[in-house]
């Protein structure tokens, strides 16, 4: 259960807690912990369709699922044969949205380098952790695009 995230300021760079996830094909990415409410596992047998969306019943509401590996062309995402999906739950305007990832790997502290971000991109920058450069997912942008085309 993740209820909240902490962050600290050092100079003018912000250190934040980040959830490191795998998208398959050896691609790891980071999600700001402040964008995460919960980390869940969802049974594939619980998936349903509503309009063009894949959804799951979650805490007495219908939660749409966003296939993050598919967005980044990393893996099969929803197409994988696993019985269980790893889902990062995000709240947008009071509603839960599930972000499907291949695996939830770790929670680390990192400073987002926004200089590598591309305007209008699904990547908001990157962090360095364990001697690796990891792109940070722009959750706000992904959710906006999803809601624009959902239905």
Predicted regions and their residues:
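Conserved secondary-structure micro-motifs at functional edges
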Residues: 1-151
